[in-house]
């Protein structure tokens, strides 16, 4: 069983008891069996479990818990970054919490993710005219501007050579289908807490913590997926 297949168990629209089939066992699993399996998964892989369901907007509590657990992971790894060890304990925790929050947002990002348009401050109008960046919507999608969220683009040279459309991973988004949160945005948020982290220090050192935490979320989700699969085998 995969994590995606159990999202429906958290939907309030589902009032009928759901029965699913385990991949190997001929015995059907009832809704209570699945919830018990989820409880065990949450205990064994707390970060991955909370991160996934927070990403799927199933629970705001899971989202907050994932960021809190991720911040603790960041705190344990902060000794690798001299710029962070020089901060006071309060400042260090505040900075790491900010980085963890943005790491989660980056992890949960998809082509359909919407955010307020910075050009018009979410108003849809610039100087009384329709904002050209968001077309007056006040929000912009994270979908890659080159591949439009598909993750692949036409290789024009090979297409002309072969006479049929030839696709390749989009170079702009590396095949993700969406644009990641710029690290400069995270740096500006960190500067609201402390001025001790300079742009040079951020680019050379502290920014790596952001990348580490994003990768950690993906690793932990994979571990939660594997754990659930073993439990429901």
PLM ranges: what are they?
Residues 8-9, 51-54, 97, 102, ...:
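Charged/polar, solvent-exposed surface patches and flexible loops
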Residues 84-86, 109-120, 219-232:
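Short glycine-rich, low-complexity/disordered patches
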Residues 111-180:
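Cys/His-rich short segments
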Residues 170, 181-233:
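Alpha-helical oligomerization segments
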Residues 73, 152-155, 165-168, 191-194, ...:
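Short, surface-exposed, charged/polar-biased interaction segments
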Residues 51, 60, 161, 187-189:
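Generic secondary-structure boundary signal with a strong preference for alpha-helix termini
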Residues 1-115:
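N-terminal alpha-helical interaction blocks
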């Amino acid at each position: 069983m995969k994590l995606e297949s159990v999202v429906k168990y958290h939907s309030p629209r589902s009032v009928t008891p759901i029965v699913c089939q385990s991949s190997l066992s001929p015995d059907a699993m009832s809704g209570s069996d699945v919830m018990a399996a989820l409880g065990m998964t949450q205990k064994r892989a707390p970060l991955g479990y909370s991160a996934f369901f927070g990403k799927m907007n199933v629970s705001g509590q899971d989202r907050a818990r994932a960021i809190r657990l991720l911040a603790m992971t960041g705190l344990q790894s902060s000794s690798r970054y001299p710029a962070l060890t020089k901060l006071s304990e309060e400042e260090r925790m505040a900075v790491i919490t900010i980085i963890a929050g943005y790491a989660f947002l980056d992890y949960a990002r998809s082509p359909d993710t919407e955010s307020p348009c910075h050009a018009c401050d979410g108003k849809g109008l610039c100087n009384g005219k329709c904002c050209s960046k968001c077309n007056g919507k006040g929000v912009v999608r994270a979908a890659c501007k080159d591949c439009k969220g598909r993750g692949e683009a036409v290789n024009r040279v090979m297409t002309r050579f072969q006479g049929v459309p030839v696709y390749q991973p989009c170079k702009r988004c590396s095949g993700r289908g969406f644009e990641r949160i710029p690290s400069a945005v995270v740096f500006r948020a960190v500067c609201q807490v402390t001025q001790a982290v300079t742009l040079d220090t951020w680019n050379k050192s502290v920014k790596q913590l952001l990348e580490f935490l994003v990768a950690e979320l993906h690793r932990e989700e994979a571990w939660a997926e594997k754990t659930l699969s073993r439990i429901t085998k």
